[in-house]
């Protein structure tokens, strides 16, 4: 409801190909998603909410989307992802390269080095470092790997730009209204140097990039702007009224911060498979100062008119999921036997154990008496994103004994993600970013009181977890109400719509001194893999 913020219908769609881990190779840090999953999800989710409230559907005035980023895809001249063409239907390199894909690490290092040696460091808005998770590294990696991709790829498009382009019928990659948030945060676009780095920069990197550079959209807008109007075909397919406006796309974590009601002084902790920590500052208070070693610092990336900051962990919930999968290995390999007479019963038992294991681990970990000699972990199972990116780092676990239990190991892993969060917050604060309150959103914040309490204990700060299961979608709602003309600004829409009750986690002061001893060991241990 655009007047109250009340959720009157919702829907969730799980991508089937992604669920089967098709086109992925975790051992190679390769994670791809098929564009058909997105199209199927779009039809399902909007169709389901429209069907749930046929009385409200005729009053829908705007649609906005947020997606993971940088999740780009090579497209042809009609802005069609190459994977939707028959000859590329099963080619992972023709699909969307998911944000956490690290196959472009070598290319990222080349870009970082070229930026450092250039007259202008074009990576300065991403902490003087360009990540393998970002647009140009992925683009270069794909082009270098396939002659036919170099032949057939006309441009590369972010997922958050492609969905609005699909809905509005934009079929020229160079003419779409791209996301300012994605361009500034992931593509080295900055007003200070007139947009993207010059062609000479890309030519020095690899001439294979030049056609892409020339053909991508040079026009981007903040998310309080419209990308266009939905086409008649999509209007009919989704059951929407005519004339629905489609907003410029946004990055999910940034939208989540808006949905959580972010304002200056708030750090929003978006805690899911990874973690993104978002903050705002007025431009004049930063005085042109850039924070080194974070993931993004971009004017108007989160809220128009404010500097948006992004930092985070490349693995958060994925760290816990790794441990769950490790413990479930015997269930999957020994208990489940498809040909056995009781195969269905075995499968049900394995699924029941898998569903319950994290909750039980958290219960037991919460009961542990905190000791200095407990196992200590680092959290870099997918590299370190911030502070000071080091994607080559790996996770560690020390202090194991014959008496070490599974809950103690789970505690160490959760504690490591909390220590990483504290390191980021301390780094932001030391560089002038105001931190007065912490707000938690995302799946982990909703599902794991144990992790949230541990975060409060480690950071020494109260954390409010808002009662909104889909904060990122709520941020898109905020943007949609602005482009529909219901509100004059993002801040005005937030005041009207983002008034959620919250659960508060207060730090337990008696645990803080011992946790800080362990934190110092965590930081020291973090130096070992780098020497």
Regions found by a protein language model. Name each.
Residues 29, 47, 51-97, 125-133, ...:
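Short beta-strand-loop/turn "lid" adjacent to the catalytic site in phosphate-handling enzymes
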Residues 94-146, 150, 187-200, 298-352, ...:
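Glycine-rich phosphate-binding loop plus the immediately following alpha-helix
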Residues 109, 255-259, 313-317, 321-324, ...:
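Glycine-rich phosphate-binding/hydrolytic loop that grips phosphoryl groups
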Residues 112-250, 334, 378-382, 410, ...:
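Gly/Ser/Thr-rich active-site cleft segment
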Residues 133, 311, 319-321, 326-347, ...:
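Acidic, glycine/GT-rich loop-and beta-edge segments that sit at the periphery of enzyme/chaperone cores
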Residues 134, 188-304, 315, 327, ...:
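ATP-dependent carbohydrate kinase catalytic cores
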């Amino acid at each position: 409801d655009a007047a109250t913020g009340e959720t009157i219908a919702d829907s969730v769609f799980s991508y089937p190909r992604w669920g089967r881990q098709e086109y992925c190779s975790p051992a190679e840090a390769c994670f791809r998603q098929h564009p058909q999953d997105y199209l199927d999800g779009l039809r399902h989710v909007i169709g389901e909410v429209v069907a749930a409230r046929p009385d409200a559907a005729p009053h829908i005035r705007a649609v906005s989307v947020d997606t993971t980023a940088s999740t780009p895809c090579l497209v042809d001249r009609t802005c069609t992802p190459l994977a939707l063409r028959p000859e590329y239907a099963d080619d992972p390199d023709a699909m969307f390269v998911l944000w956490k894909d690290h196959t472009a690490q070598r290319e990222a290092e080349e870009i970082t080095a070229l930026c450092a040696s250039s007259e202008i460091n074009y990576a300065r808005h991403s902490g003087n470092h360009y990540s393998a998770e970002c647009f140009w590294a992925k683009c270069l990696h794909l082009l270098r790997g396939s002659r036919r991709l170099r032949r057939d790829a006309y441009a590369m498009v972010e997922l958050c730009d492609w969905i609005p382009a699909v809905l509005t019928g934009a079929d020229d990659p160079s003419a779409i209204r791209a996301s300012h948030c994605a361009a500034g945060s992931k593509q080295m676009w900055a007003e200070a140097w007139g947009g993207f780095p010059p062609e000479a920069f890309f030519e020095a990197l690899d001439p294979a990039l030049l056609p892409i550079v020339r053909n991508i959209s040079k026009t981007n807008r903040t998310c309080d702007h419209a990308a266009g109007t939905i086409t008649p075909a999509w209007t009919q397919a989704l059951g929407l009224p005519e004339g629905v406006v489609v907003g410029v796309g946004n990055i999910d974590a940034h939208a989540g911060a808006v949905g959580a009601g972010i304002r200056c002084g708030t750090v929003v902790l978006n805690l899911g498979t990874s973690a993104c920590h978002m903050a705002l500052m007025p431009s004049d208070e930063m005085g042109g100062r850039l924070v080194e070693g974070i993931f993004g610092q971009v004017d108007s990336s989160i809220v128009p008119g404010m500097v948006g900051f992004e930092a985070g962990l490349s693995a958060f919930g994925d760290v816990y999921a790794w441990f769950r999968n490790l413990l479930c290995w015997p269930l999957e390999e020994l208990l489940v036997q498809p040909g056995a007479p009781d195969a269905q019963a075995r499968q049900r038992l394995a699924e029941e154990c898998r569903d319950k294991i994290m909750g039980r681990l958290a219960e037991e970990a919460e009961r542990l008496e905190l000791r200095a000699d407990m196992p200590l972990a680092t959290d870099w199972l997918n590299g370190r994103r911030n502070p000071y990116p080091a994607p080559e780092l790996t996770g560690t676990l020390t202090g194991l004994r014959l008496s070490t239990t599974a809950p103690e190991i789970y505690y160490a892993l959760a504690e490591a993600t909390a220590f990483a969060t504290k390191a980021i917050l301390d780094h932001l604060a030391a560089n002038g970013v105001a931190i007065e309150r912490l707000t938690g959103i995302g799946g982990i914040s909703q599902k794991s009181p144990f992790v949230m309490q541990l975060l409060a204990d480690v950071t020494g700060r109260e954390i409010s977890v808002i009662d909104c299961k889909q904060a990122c979608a709520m941020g898109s709602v905020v943007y949609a109400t602005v482009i529909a003309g219901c509100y004059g600004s993002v801040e005005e829409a937030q005041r009207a719509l983002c008034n959620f009750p919250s659960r508060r986690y207060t730090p337990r002061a008696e645990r803080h001194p011992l946790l800080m001893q362990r934190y110092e060991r965590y930081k020291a241990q973090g130096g070992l893999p780098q020497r």
